[in-house]
Amino acid sequence: MVFKKTQPSPSLKNPERIQSFKKLSKKIGIKFSKIEYYNTAFIHSSYKNENPEILEDNERLEFLGDSVLGLVAARSLFQKYPKASEGELSRIKSKIVSTPILNSIAEKLNLGEYLLLGKGEKNSQGKGRRKIAANLFESLVGAIYLDRGFEVAEKFIVQHLLEFAENPDMEESVRDYKTQLQEYSQKHFKTLPVYRMKGESGPDHSKTFQVSVRIRDQWEASGYGASKKIAEQNAAKELYIRIRRGF
């Protein structure tokens, strides 16, 4: 992502700065009533730290935008997948509001063009650069919410974010393989699958669990995940697919 070079001042008295927001307003199809919200949304904390006259950066708007984003995503997925469990909805939500996807949207909208970034931070690469872009999308959502209200912010989010929910990989995330395996096992083997914890690894804040699932002594598979439930789902998926393929 290409970020705009640091300007001497983010003052809205700067004609170039005002013109840039008119350009952004036209690009995203939202009329800005209070440009100061958007000005703040595009001031990174590193720029504020290097310019004492700047009173506020975009971190508070980022916090607000993250909450609005989460609500819109949760409500939309709740309506889209009426049979999905809480765990399944959480998994797909975490994917569509993840840093890589938010970064992709920021890239698509070229939000870095409007960002005031400190000299030191401009040299960041890789994950640091992607995180800045993702946070920028959240701060823009926060500004839209304050300026135009929830409905406009929701429309903007749905337009640019929830298209990712239509991705086949997302559809796959909400398939309940435990239920499918259980129903198949009862019908064809007259018994229920048996799950067992095989182990866990990693630090307390980032554990990986291993679970095995067996049907009689005939079929067995293992799965891994950040929680026991996810590991069970992955094990069930592995065994279900294996059984259906006949090996």
Swiss-Prot record:
Catalytic center residues: 66, 138
Annotated DRBM domain residues: 176-245
Top-level taxon: Bacteria
Predominant localisation class: cytoplasm
Record key words, sorted: Cytoplasm, Endonuclease, Hydrolase, Magnesium, Metal-binding, mRNA processing, Nuclease, RNA-binding, rRNA processing, rRNA-binding, tRNA processing
GO process terms (BP): mRNA processing; regulation of gene expression; rRNA processing; tRNA processing
Single GO MF descriptor: metal ion binding
Gene Ontology CC entries for this record: cytoplasm
UniProt-annotated location(s): Cytoplasm
CDD domains xrefs: DSRM_RNAse_III_family (cd10845), RIBOc (cd00593)
EC number assigned by the record: 3.1.26.3
Cofactor: Mg(2+)
Alphabetized SUPFAM superfamilies for the sequence: dsRNA-binding domain-like (SSF54768), RNase III domain-like (SSF69065)
Enzyme class: hydrolase
Sequence positions that bind Mg(2+): 62, 135, 138
Family as reported in the entry's similarity comment: Belongs to the ribonuclease III family.
Assembly with partners or alone: Homodimer.
Function: Digests double-stranded RNA. Involved in the processing of primary rRNA transcript to yield the immediate precursors to the large and small rRNAs (23S and 16S). Processes some mRNAs, and tRNAs when they are encoded in the rRNA operon. Processes pre-crRNA and tracrRNA of type II CRISPR loci if present in the organism.
Protein name: Ribonuclease 3
Native organism: Leptospira borgpetersenii serovar Hardjo-bovis (strain JB197)
